[in-house]
Amino acid sequence: MTAGDEEAAAATALPVTIELLLASPRSRYVGRPADGPEPPPAASELHESVELRAGLGIVGDRYFAKPAHRGASVTLFAAESLEAVGRLLGLGRPLDASATRRNVVTRGLDVDALRGRTISIDSGDGPVLFRVNRPANPCAWMDQVLAPGAFRAMRGLGGMRCEPLTDGVLRLGTATVEVDPADPRDVHPA
């Protein structure tokens, strides 16, 4: 790699923070929202780090290796989107990102602008490549677990469903994101 190549690579690396990592062995939002969510499992669903497998998802998560979720086994969500939902609803309190059931919550990245892109996230253990495939649409449970009106307010702000393309580990804390340099579109920090 030449000095020019290194400068170009550094220019495309976006500094972000991974604020939350969630891997749950089962879905807690089943049945009718009015009945409330199932209780959390004995083991914590929130993790300091998660292990990913190419094409399969997060080890230990409910969508890991499920054929129906190929291409959508990992959800990526921006903390700023949840803050925008709170403002739209006129709430004077922060919303709990873990209630959204998104796997990876970041700060400093416009996640919803990444559709159709390939990205890498490196939190210190080497880059993990993802294909960002489609929106992670909210469900009616959001009205129950976040706040009334959250289901509608999250439309277009629900994050993205991704497929890991490489094995790797993600950790809480600082990270860098690189957007596929072959793609001419430009993604800006949130």
What spans do the regions from the language model cover?
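Short alpha-helix capping/helix-loop boundary micro-motifs
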Residues: 106, 159-168
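Short, surface-exposed secondary-structure boundary micro-motifs
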Residues: 124, 135, 175, 181-182
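Electropositive, beta-rich accessory/interaction domains or terminal extensions
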Residues: 1-125, 129, 134, 187-190
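Short, basic/aromatic beta-hairpin or loop at an interaction surface
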Residues: 93-100, 144-158
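Well-ordered mid-protein domain cores that form the structural environment of catalytic cofactors
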Residues: 136-141, 150
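Loop/turn positions that initiate beta-strands
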Residues: 116, 127, 167-175
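Short, Lys/Arg- and Gly-enriched loop/turn segments at beta-strand edges
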Residues: 140-142, 182-190
